[in-house]
Amino acid sequence: MADVPNDAPEHCPGTSSDQAGKSSACQGCPNQSICASGATKAPDPAIEEIKQKMTSVKHKILVLSGKGGVGKSTFSAHLSHALASDSSKEVALLDVDICGPSIPKIMGLEGEQVHQSGSGWSPVYVEDNLAVMSIGFLLSSPDDAVIWRGPKKNGMIKQFLRDVDWGEVDYLIVDTPPGTSDEHLSIVQYLSGAGIDGAVIITTPQEVSLQDVRKEIRFCKKVNLPILGVIENMSGFVCPKCKNTSQIFPPTTGGAQRMCEELNLPLLGRIPLDPRIGKSCDEGKSFLTEVPDSPAAAAYQSIVQKIRDYCASHSASDDSC
């Protein structure tokens, strides 16, 4: 990963680049000599520290999306709620959407703060077995903007993984920003030694969303990140009275199903639109317990069971996880 120091010139190639310290853009940079020496290309010691920290976490799942507004954070939150509904399981939700942290609002934790202990930062708990960490807990107001360059974001993600006292955890769900950015590279790099079970990719039925999801899939393949499957969110609207389904966002090119068939990926399921999901998120409640008999809740539960089954088989075939 090519990190760019805060005091670097505009066209800095990055400290991990082959051109580090050698590019014309490096002339006059205070970091030129150390970059040219190759010292910056040494493995980040934090990777080994995080690997040791993550030995207490059984399963690590990233939630990705090609673009914003497709329900990625909503899914991350409800996946966490669903997994934590089994009181024998310990679940943690990590929000690495540094510039757009919505998890505190969705989980009903706005105004909560992180506390320091001898073991590190203590996450905020929704339930006894559901812990949450987000940069939103470090802001004085939810309206505060986080205006950070890549290196500072990377440093915060490193701190979340290394310094948070998660304890013994069965599932760590990582809610990422939309697209492919520094945050994605950082989380994959820092967890590379600890082992990631895989990524769940969220899309909506329209081609404009699927187009960006294909980029996300290529990213996963380039960084050797396994893909658990794709979820089509906002997939039709089921009328609560007549039970007929209307396509609010028509799958003009076949939707996620055709894309998954073409790319040989599992389609984990389709979640229909339900205005009550948005209402539950605004109120910081779990839609799965608020409206458990709805078609959307049934779709969620089916998808969550597939993720449970994947993780169970993954543990059986790979003792490192």
Curated annotation (Swiss-Prot):
A single GO CC term, please? cytosol
| Record's cofactor remark | Binds 4 [4Fe-4S] clusters per heterotetramer. Contains two stable clusters in the N-termini of nubp1 and two labile, bridging clusters between subunits of the nubp1-nubp2 heterotetramer.
User: Which InterPro entries has this protein been placed in?
Assistant: Mrp-like_CS, Mrp/NBP35_ATP-bd, NUBP1/Nbp35, P-loop_NTPase, YlxH/NBP35
Query: Where are the stretches annotated Disordered?
Result: 1-23
The UniProt entry's GO biological process terms, in alphabetical order, are: iron-sulfur cluster assembly
Binding, ATP: G66, K67, G68, G69, V70, G71, K72, S73
Tell me the cofactors it needs: [4Fe-4S] cluster
Question: Ranges of Polar residues compositional bias?
Answer: 14-23
Write the record's keywords in alphabetical order, separated by commas: 4Fe-4S, ATP-binding, Cytoplasm, Iron, Iron-sulfur, Metal-binding, Nucleotide-binding
Tell me, in one coarse class, where this protein mainly resides.
cytoplasm
Looking at the UniProt entry, the stretches that span the membrane are none
**Which of this chain's residues are annotated to bind [4Fe-4S] cluster 2?**
C239, C242
MF-aspect GO terms: 4 iron, 4 sulfur cluster binding; ATP binding; ATP-dependent FeS chaperone activity; iron-sulfur cluster binding; metal ion binding
Q: Where does [4Fe-4S] cluster 1 bind?
A: C12, C26, C29, C35
Location of this chain's protein in the cell: Cytoplasm
Q: What does this protein do?
A: Component of the cytosolic iron-sulfur (Fe/S) protein assembly (CIA) machinery. Required for maturation of extramitochondrial Fe-S proteins. The nubp1-nubp2 heterotetramer forms a Fe-S scaffold complex, mediating the de novo assembly of an Fe-S cluster and its transfer to target apoproteins.
Q: How does it assemble?
A: Heterotetramer of 2 nubp1 and 2 nubp2 chains.
HAMAP family linked: Mrp_NBP35, NUBP1
Task: Name the protein family.
Answer: Belongs to the Mrp/NBP35 ATP-binding proteins family. NUBP1/NBP35 subfamily.
Query: This protein is called what?
Result: Cytosolic Fe-S cluster assembly factor nubp1
Organism for this UniProt entry: Danio rerio
